[in-house]
Amino acid sequence: MTQTSYVLNYWNIPGRGESIRVILALGGIKFENNFVPLPLPLENPENQSPPPFDDGTWGKLKPHTPWGTLPTILLPSGETIGQQRAILRYLGKLIKHEGNYLYPEDPETSARVDGF
């Protein structure tokens, strides 16, 4: 089944997801933010071992990510891309700004872009 927009999965903080959100907005690409609760320790008044963590969202999502990390982006095709830089490169090859793709084809120029 094909979806109609992109789905960005990232923690409920700006972090590495923010640059992806900016590029999607710059390109006018519709996307859904799927904010994943941070898996931080919760209060542990009963000294449970191991201490309780988040609501379980990340534990359920993690096995379905390409590298067991966030951010990921679910493409309209149903394919999932993981890792911030891979996502940014993908989007940079899709999105034009002032007539030019955001990610250059020239190896030297693209290396400079990767250096940022």
For the regions a protein language model found, what residue spans apply to each?
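GST-like domain detector, emphasizing the conserved glutathione-binding G-site
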Residues: 2-116
